Amino acid sequence: MAHRFASDRDEVSPPTRALSRRRLLGAASTLLLLPIIPRIAMAARLLAVRTWPAEEYTRVTLELDSELKAEHFTLDTPHRMVVDIQGIDISPGLNELVRKVRTDDPYISSLRVAQNRPNVVRIVFDLKQAIAPQVFTLKPAGDYKFRLVLDFYPKVAQDPLAALLKNNPQKIDEDPLAQILADIGRNPKGTSMASLPVLPSSIAPSSSSRSITPYKQERGRRVVTIALDPGHGGEDPGAIGKGGTREKDVVLSIAQRLKAKIDATPGMRAYLTRDGDYFVPLHVRVEKARRVKADLFISIHADAYVRPTAGGSSVYVLSSSGASSTSARWLADKENAADLIGGINLNVQDPRLAKVLLDLSTSAQIKDSTTVAQTMLGELKNVYRLHKPQVEHAGFAVLKAPDMPSILVETAFISNPDEERMLRNAADQDKFAVALLVGISRYFSANPHVASIG
């Protein structure tokens, strides 16, 4: 009996040991998978829903604790957009989205939310017009977690220039400089460098001279267009003060005040890159200004720093290194070289002449921008203290258009409690707007040659 057990043990032992090892490995795998399986099955948690309706486009944002996938399609008669969001279940937060639709939304009239199938929620947007939607996700950034973004753009994009002319139909006269450059474009190889227009130098007014020279539109000269760019907007609040003041709100208010003053000035008109609480990408801000053939671009901001004592106004222009980088990219882009040379369509066939004109445009932009900035700094000093007494240089993407003087104005430090209160005050906002208006007027009075040449 003992021998038989020993013999059985000898024959059966090897497979038994192998089986035991397989069982142990299987058990270990199960243990490793246990914490993962509930994670996979768990639906994402909705943290917030936000809507940003605007004439330009409406944005709907869903913020979640994990990344999701979404599919969408549109339907006609009537116009609708259907969005299927995977990895989420119906929740009170999604029902809240229904209540966030505003009656004045240009694109969305209503929406419905339902659990389409397990872990898939369907949102149906009833639309007021045909749209060209964009649906994408964003990784965590700033204070935000994962975001699913739904943008509702019009099927036919709005033209900033048409809107500007409709709202401010001042007569646009022929620009002789543009005509000269157009002639060059028609006959590039027969053009010598001596025939290129020579622009007079831009000289900043003396800092000791504080007399105000009102801008006067000369006969035959077209209306001057100023593009005002209130920073941030929509999902991007900009800097936030200790008292909860958001940069995007105060700079929009200052820009709107300045626009009203510019529009009331003969020979001038203003265009806002955003006129409400919505987000505009940096390159779109520049393209808008170029589309309306702006003669000057002013980006308006409120500064912030870790030390609450930091304060004062600042003015920035593009650094020469930044401008060189932009030029290098554009010159390397053969597709754009024929149509966009510093934003100036010259129809130039000679690449050597095109490069010279682009270099001239870039150099003139930096030179004129610095002149504007110096003038603005002097006027801001009249209404408030300066953070630094000289113009600052940096590679701001929004200042990289080579065909118009571009400056960025930091009105004050929203991180400074005293200046935060000042930025909230309507009278102080008006003072900043007046200072900028006077700076604009002084600049164009001293430099009447500066004009867009599109």
Please provide the spans of the model-predicted regions.
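Flexible glycine-/small-residue-rich
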Residues: L64-S66, I85-G87, L127-Q129, F152-P154, ...
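Short, solvent-exposed loop/turn elements at domain surfaces
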Residues: E71-H72, P92-G93, E235-A239, P417
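Active-site-adjacent mobile loop/cap segments within catalytic or ligand-binding domains
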Residues: A70, L296, V306, L357-G454
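Catalytic-core regions of hydrolytic enzymes
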Residues: I184-P351, T362-Q374, R421, V434, ...
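Signal-peptide-cleaved, periplasmic/extracellular N-terminal interaction regions immediately downstream
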Residues: A2-T225
